[in-house]
């Protein structure tokens, strides 16, 4: 069971209680924690759209601590990151693996960060298929199509050649924060808050 802390904010009109995520949203901070699925993606997308409507000129800060998750859910977040006008600052806290690492790399260039002891992992898409041979063939073609799309975006985000991305994502490829900076997934390793 997840415990969600509440914070008290004092104003000129008294006190107001917020759950911590609502309070962070006031500061344009979105937390992407845990597995990426349709529910998590809907929440992240909704928050980005809300923050764009509030102020399309101010950056949005997306903190990521995720083992990855469903490709289509992650792609809805990715598409929204590109769709909204504000720059998206991505910050890895803990880990960004699989789709989490992909989204970390998709922040606005120059605004992709990691804390020093985070780990980042990229790999090829995971999938499974069952049913008739033709159904399995259809699923295999689709996962190869998604692999090609993801590798192309990672190559663009990192500046690495597509062939290197394909080789490195063939199996789990773990990096430290510093190694992910050298690879091009992030732009800087943060020791202190930059806000």
Swiss-Prot record:
Catalyzed reactions per annotation: Hydrolysis of proteins to small peptides in the presence of ATP and magnesium. alpha-casein is the usual test substrate. In the absence of ATP, only oligopeptides shorter than five residues are hydrolyzed (such as succinyl-Leu-Tyr-|-NHMec, and Leu-Tyr-Leu-|-Tyr-Trp, in which cleavage of the -Tyr-|-Leu- and -Tyr-|-Trp bonds also occurs)
Cellular-component GO terms for this entry: cytoplasm; endopeptidase Clp complex
Key word Hydrolase present: yes
Gene3D superfamilies for this protein: 2-enoyl-CoA Hydratase, Chain A, domain 1
Localization annotation: Cytoplasm
Keyword RNA-binding: no
EC category name: hydrolase
Keywords: Cytoplasm, Hydrolase, Protease, Serine protease
CDD domains registered for this protein in UniProt: S14_ClpP_2
InterPro entries found in the cross-reference section: ClpP, ClpP/crotonase-like_dom_sf, ClpP/TepA, ClpP_His_AS, ClpP_Ser_AS
Predominant location: cytoplasm
GO molecular function, one term: ATPase binding
One BP term from GO: protein quality control for misfolded or incompletely synthesized proteins
Catalytic site: 98 (nucleophile), 123
Record's subunit section: Fourteen ClpP subunits assemble into 2 heptameric rings which stack back to back to give a disk-like structure with a central cavity, resembling the structure of eukaryotic proteasomes.
Family classification: Belongs to the peptidase S14 family.
Function: Cleaves peptides in various proteins in a process that requires ATP hydrolysis. Has a chymotrypsin-like activity. Plays a major role in the degradation of misfolded proteins.
NCBIfam families in the cross-refs: clpP (TIGR00493), PRK00277.1 (NF001368), PRK12553.1 (NF009205)
Name by which UniProt lists this protein: ATP-dependent Clp protease proteolytic subunit
Organism per entry: Wolinella succinogenes (strain ATCC 29543 / DSM 1740 / CCUG 13145 / JCM 31913 / LMG 7466 / NCTC 11488 / FDC 602W)
Lineage: Bacteria, Pseudomonadati, Campylobacterota, Epsilonproteobacteria, Campylobacterales
